[in-house]
Curated annotation (Swiss-Prot):
Residues 270-277 are annotated as: G4 motif. The gene is Gnaq. It comes from Rattus norvegicus (Rat). GTP binds at S50, G51, K52, S53, T54, S156, L180, R181, R183, N274, K275, D277, A331. It is an enzyme of class 3 (hydrolase). Residues 41-54 are annotated as: G1 motif. Residues 329-334 are annotated as: G5 motif. This is Guanine nucleotide-binding protein G(q) subunit alpha. A lipid is attached at C9, C10 (S-palmitoyl cysteine). GO terms for molecular function: alkylglycerophosphoethanolamine phosphodiesterase activity; enzyme regulator activity; G protein activity; G protein-coupled receptor binding; G-protein beta/gamma-subunit complex binding; GTP binding; GTPase activator activity; GTPase activity.
Length: 359
C-alpha cells in the first residue's frame, strides 16, 4: 500500500467522522428548533390597570383548572380590602373636590372609614358595612363617583358597592366575576403556562406601573408575541404616578417604545383595546375631543371613538411590513376573551409555523 493510499484512507475516515459530527449537530439543531416551537412565549404588556392580570385570570378559567371554592376563598380578604380602598379614595376626594355630604351623619361614617388600615382588613362587619352603605347612598358621594376621572379610583368600585349585601353576608364566597374584578397591583413578574394543541403557551405578565418596568428587561428573549393591552376608557384619566399626564398618552408612548425595540423585531404584535364596556358608558358624558383635539368624529359614539383610538396606536408603527393584529375586548367577560383568544391563538400558531417553514 502506497503512502498516498494510506493518507487517502485516513482522510476519508476523518472526513466521515467530520460529516458524522456535522450531521449530529444538524440533528440537534433541528431538535432544539422543534422543542422551541413547542413552547411559545407571550409577553403581556401595557400600562398599569390596563387589564393584564385579568387576562391571565381568564386564561386560567378558559384553558386551565379555573378557580375552586378553596381558591375563591383566598380572594375574600382582597375583595373587602378593595371595598375599603375605594371608599377611602372617595372620602378623600370629597375633601379635595369640596363636595359636601347631603346627610350630616355621613361625616362621622367617613371618619370611621378613613381611619381603617386597609392592609390589616380581614373581615367585613358592622359598623363598617352600615357606614359604607350609608356613604354610597349619599348624593354627595355619588357626585364624587361621577367625577372619578379627577382622582384615582378602581374600575370595580361600582361593581362591589352595588352588591354590599351579598359581600357582607357571613357565608360570602367570592364568585368567579368577583375574582376577575379584584384589583391587586402586579409587582414582579407572573408567568402562567398552559397547554393547547400540544403547544405550551407561556404567558408572562409584568407590572405596568412605571416602577415595575425596569424589571422587564430579562423577559425579552425569544418572545413569540407581544400582547399589548390598552384601556379604552383611560382617554380622560391621569396617571397614578403623575397627575398631569394623560394615561392614554402614556400608553401610546410605551407602545411606540415596545414596537421599535430591536428585541421584538421578529415578535408578532397583538393589540388588545380593552375595557370597551367602560368606554361605551363614559363616552356618553365625557367627550373624546376634549382630550384629543384631533378627533373630529361624532360625540357619544363608542364605535367612532374606539376606531379613532385604534388608529392612533396603529399609526405609531414605523414598519409598514409589520402587521399589528387588533381586537376590542372586555377582560372581565369570559365569553368575549374565549372568542378573542381563539382567534389570537390561531394567528400565533400560523405565524409560528411560517417562521419554521412548516407551511
Amino acid at each position: 500500500m502506497t503512502l498516498e493510499s494510506i493518507m487517502a484512507c485516513c482522510l476519508s475516515e476523518e472526513a466521515k467522522e467530520a460529516r458524522r459530527i456535522n450531521d449530529e449537530i444538524e440533528r440537534q439543531l433541528r431538535r432544539d428548533k422543534r422543542d422551541a416551537r413547542r413552547e411559545l412565549k407571550l409577553l403581556l404588556l401595557g400600562t398599569g390597570e390596563s387589564g393584564k392580570s385579568t387576562f391571565i385570570k381568564q386564561m386560567r378559567i378558559i384553558h386551565g383548572s379555573g378557580y375552586s371554592d378553596e381558591d375563591k376563598r383566598g380572594f375574600t380578604k382582597l375583595v373587602y380590602q378593595n371595598i375599603f380602598t375605594a371608599m377611602q379614595a372617595m372620602v378623600r376626594a370629597m375633601d379635595t373636590l369640596k363636595i359636601p355630604y347631603k346627610y350630616e351623619h355621613n361625616k362621622a361614617h367617613a371618619q370611621l372609614v378613613r381611619e381603617v388600615d386597609v392592609e390589616k382588613v380581614s373581615a367585613f362587619e358592622n359598623p363598617y358595612v352600615d357606614a359604607i352603605k350609608s356613604l354610597w347612598n349619599d348624593p354627595g358621594i355619588q357626585e364624587c363617583y361621577d367625577r372619578r376621572r379627577e382622582y384615582q379610583l378602581s374600575d370595580s368600585t361600582k361593581y362591589y358597592l352595588n352588591d354590599l349585601d351579598r359581600v357582607a353576608d357571613p357565608s360570602y364566597l367570592p364568585t368567579q366575576q368577583d375574582v376577575l374584578r379584584v384589583r391587586v397591583p402586579t409587582t414582579g413578574i407572573i408567568e402562567y403556562p398552559f397547554d393547547l394543541q400540544s403547544v405550551i403557551f407561556r404567558m408572562v405578565d409584568v407590572g405596568g406601573q412605571r416602577s415595575e418596568r425596569r424589571k422587564w428587561i430579562h423577559c425579552f428573549e425569544n418572545v413569540t408575541s407581544i400582547m399589548f393591552l390598552v384601556a379604552l376608557s383611560e382617554y380622560d384619566q391621569v396617571l397614578v404616578e403623575s397627575d398631569n399626564e394623560n394615561r392614554m398618552e402614556e400608553s401610546k408612548a410605551l407602545f411606540r417604545t415596545i414596537i421599535t425595540y430591536p428585541w421584538f423585531q421578529n415578535s408578532s404584535v397583538i393589540l388588545f383595546l380593552n375595557k370597551k364596556d367602560l368606554l361605551e358608558e363614559k363616552i356618553m358624558y365625557s367627550h373624546l375631543v376634549d382630550y384629543f383635539p384631533e378627533y373630529d368624529g361624532p360625540q357619544r359614539d363608542a364605535q367612532a371613538a374606539r376606531e379613532f383610538i385604534l388608529k392612533m396606536f396603529v399609526d405609531l408603527n414605523p414598519d409598514s411590513d409589520k402587521i399589528i393584529y387588533s381586537h376590542f375586548t372586555c377582560a372581565t367577560d369570559t365569553e368575549n376573551i374565549r372568542f378573542v383568544f381563539a382567534a389570537v391563538k390561531d394567528t400565533i400558531l400560523q405565524l409560528n409555523l411560517k417562521e419554521y417553514n412548516l407551511v
